[in-house]
């Protein structure tokens, strides 16, 4: 599980940086959702196509995309989807294949075994629009209606052979909630000279907090009820640019900076905006920039592990995500060196997220990053 968590974590941060490159827009994704969906495709990929996918997903360290990668995903997904939790978290994967196309039963069996994913056959050739709507309805059901139109108009056509969909939905309450009476409009500094109003929540509670000198950033951990999931927030100091923090951030550092022995547990005054983000990404371009090119090219893609037919290639990888952070908690959906804290006696540390920050929703036991984002502008 550890090699896989590291691979997924590395992929998560690579993607977070890529999607936010050179601009100050909000980003929200579920890296777990995206990587598990692509790992399903990897089951049917061979040769260079598979090698590029492993590279992009950072899986080359952990056994090069062999069976144990998929075994790792199976373990991780069953751990994450456990029913006996105090939060609601559901992931769902499905393959929608053109019904006239012959997919290998070994591929379908593996998808079912490792990813609990069924292959559903649709008529993309003559019922293109109905097929698209059918897929969107499935996603909406799996995300409690939060993700409605995953596939926009014209995203599938009569040449579509395979659409692979992942959906993830999360709803959790804070371990200690924010008091609604304390929420008030306050300014959020979008950039040096621009401020926008936000509904700023406030609570004073015992939290894990630390200060990372090398990037001048406070890190706060806000647990959800049951302590199995946390929101980890990286808030740079007023004078530090968020891009600087992103550039310095690696998965190894993320783990090192949030280790229990680096964190202080103390009473903190927390100011956090109430926010909702809804983002939609056409992933092809980003994945190609990360080196996964062959999978999208009809003449180069090798998916002979899926079908003996020729010309099978990925045409679309859509990801849509939703998060709502309120006083009670968070609702999210998506579809895929020693650090010394300066201590001052009797001063309650203040964590005031009134300027851009990064946030992660992490599964404590496995370390998996379920969701991550950057909040730059209300």
UniProtKB/Swiss-Prot annotation:
Tissues in which the UniProt entry reports expression: Brain.
Record SUPFAM superfamilies: Serpins
A Pfam family of this chain: Serpin
Signal peptide extent: none
Subcellular location as annotated: Cytoplasm
Chief site of localization: cytoplasm
Modified residues annotated as N6-acetyllysine in this record: 196
Entries under InterPro entries matching the protein: Serpin_CS, Serpin_dom, Serpin_fam, Serpin_sf, Serpin_sf_1, Serpin_sf_2
UniProt modified residues of type N-acetylmethionine: 1
Gene Ontology CC entries for this record: cytoplasm; extracellular space
Keyword Transferase: no
UniProt KW keywords: Acetylation, Cytoplasm, Protease inhibitor, Serine protease inhibitor
MF-aspect GO terms: serine-type endopeptidase inhibitor activity
Residues marked Reactive bond (site): 343-344
Gene3D superfamilies for this protein: Alpha-1-antitrypsin, domain 1 (2.30.39.10), Antithrombin, subunit I, domain 2 (3.30.497.10)
The family this protein is said to belong to: Belongs to the serpin family. Ov-serpin subfamily.
The protein's role, per its UniProt record: Inhibitor of cathepsin G, kallikrein-8 and thrombin. May play an important role in the inner ear in the protection against leakage of lysosomal content during stress. May be involved in the regulation of serine proteinases present in the brain or extravasated from the blood.
Record note on quaternary structure: Forms a complex with the monomeric form of beta-tryptase.
UniProt name for this protein: Serpin B6
Species of origin: Bos taurus
């Amino acid at each position: 599980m550890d090699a896989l968590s590291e691979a997924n974590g590395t992929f998560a941060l690579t993607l977070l940086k890529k999607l936010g490159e050179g601009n100050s827009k909000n980003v929200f994704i579920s890296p777990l959702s995206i990587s598990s969906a692509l790992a399903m495709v990897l089951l049917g990929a061979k040769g260079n196509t598979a090698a590029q996918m492993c590279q992009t997903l950072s899986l080359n360290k952990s056994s090069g995309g062999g069976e144990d990668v998929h075994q790792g995903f199976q373990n991780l997904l069953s751990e994450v989807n456990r029913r006996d939790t105090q939060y609601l978290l559901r992931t769902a994967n499905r393959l929608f294949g053109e019904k006239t196309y012959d997919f290998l039963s070994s591929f379908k069996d593996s998808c079912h075994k490792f990813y609990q994913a069924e292959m559903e056959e649709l008529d993309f050739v003559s019922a293109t629009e109905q097929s698209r709507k059918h897929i969107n309805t499935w996603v909406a059901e799996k995300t409690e209606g939060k993700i409605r139109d995953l596939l926009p108009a014209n995203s599938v056509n009569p040449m579509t052979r395979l659409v692979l969909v992942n959906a993830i939905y999360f709803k959790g309450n804070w371990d200690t909630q924010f008091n609604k009476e304390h929420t008030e409009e306050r300014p959020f500094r979008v950039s040096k000279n621009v401020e926008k109003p936000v509904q700023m929540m406030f609570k004073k509670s015992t939290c894990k907090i630390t200060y990372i000198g090398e990037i001048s950033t406070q890190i706060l951990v806000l647990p959800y009820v049951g302590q199995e999931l946390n929101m980890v927030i990286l808030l740079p100091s007023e004078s530090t640019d968020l891009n600087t923090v992103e550039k310095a951030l690696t998965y190894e550092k993320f783990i090192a900076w949030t280790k229990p022995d680096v964190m202080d547990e103390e009473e903190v005054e927390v100011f956090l905006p109430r926010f909702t983000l809804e983002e939609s990404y056409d992933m092809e371009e980003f994945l190609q920039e990360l080196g996964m090119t062959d999978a999208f090219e009809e003449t180069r893609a090798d998916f002979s592990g899926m079908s003996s037919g020729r010309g099978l290639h990925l045409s679309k990888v859509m990801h849509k995500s939703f998060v709502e952070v309120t006083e009670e908690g968070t609702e999210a959906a998506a579809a895929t060196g020693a650090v010394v804290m300066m201590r001052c006696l009797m001063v309650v540390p203040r964590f005031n997220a009134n300027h851009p920050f990064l946030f992660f929703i992490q599964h404590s036991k496995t370390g998996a990053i379920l969701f991550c984002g950057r909040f730059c502008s209300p």
